Amino acid sequence: MSEPAGPVSRCLIALGSNLGDRLDNVRAGVAGIEAAGIDVVAVSPLYETAPVGGPENQGPYLNAALLADTTRAAADVLALLHRLEASRERQRVVHWGPRTLDLDLLVYGELVSEAAALEVPHPRMHERRFVMVPVCDIAPDLVHPRLGRTMRDLLADLPVEPGDLTRLTDTWLTDTRHGATHDHP
């Protein structure tokens, strides 16, 4: 007899890649999340963004966000995301350095945790347009659990910098053309 499922929690996950086949990497992130039995409710359009922080001369990122429902505990979701990153040979060597796959648990239901092992909501998500623009494409009215404001309102507070985000495609999960998502060493 299997254990009963826990309550369903809605979570937001950010996806990014700026090494290797970036499109394949972010697609693999979504596929891995779905294969783990997490119900992906919505996926944002795909954006190309300049790297923020970290070493100079990094290639641009592909960024997206997804909204999902899960009965897994938050720590289990985070562990899954780390395993998926490792499966794409993500190396955690340089802070804000280039990465094959970056998966961040942004929001997990109403949970607020500042533990070193599990910090949700993500402490800097509301400061980053490359996170908030894709999030607002799929969950503009979601309320930030710690700040008590909608994602739309948090995005409105951020300054717009010309060229910081380029919307590439809404159909990136199914589109077989790479277009502007070419590989980066």
Please provide the spans of the model-predicted regions:
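Helix N-cap motif at beta-to-alpha junctions
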Residues: 70-73
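Short basic (Lys/Arg) and small-residue
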Residues: 66
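N-terminal beta1-alpha1 ligand-phosphate binding loop
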Residues: 2-38, 44-50
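Short N-terminal secondary-structure initiator segments
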Residues: 1-11, 75-80, 84
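Flexible, gly/pro- and Lys/Arg-enriched active-site loops
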Residues: 37, 46, 52-61, 75-185
